[in-house]
Amino acid sequence: MKIRASARKICEKCRLIRRRGRILIICSNPRHKQRQG
């Protein structure tokens, strides 16, 4: 899980999800998991 100032999609399979006011990126590739903090 990377925590970044700007979370963005890295590949086609990345999905952008808003959960409790946070932006999460969920992907089939575990390296692409991000959270905007």
Swiss-Prot record:
Pfam families in the record? Ribosomal_L36
Coiled coil stretches, renumbered: none
GO biological process per UniProt: translation
What GO MF terms are annotated? structural constituent of ribosome
Cite the SUPFAM superfamilies for this sequence: Ribosomal protein L36 (SSF57840)
GO CC, sorted alphabetically, is: chloroplast; ribonucleoprotein complex; ribosome
Which cellular compartments is it found in? Plastid, Chloroplast
Identify the PROSITE patterns for this entry: RIBOSOMAL_L36 (PS00828)
Tell me which UniProt keywords the record has, alphabetically.
Chloroplast, Plastid, Ribonucleoprotein, Ribosomal protein
The similarity annotation says: Belongs to the bacterial ribosomal protein bL36 family.
Q: What is this protein called?
A: Large ribosomal subunit protein bL36c
The organism encoding this protein is Populus trichocarpa
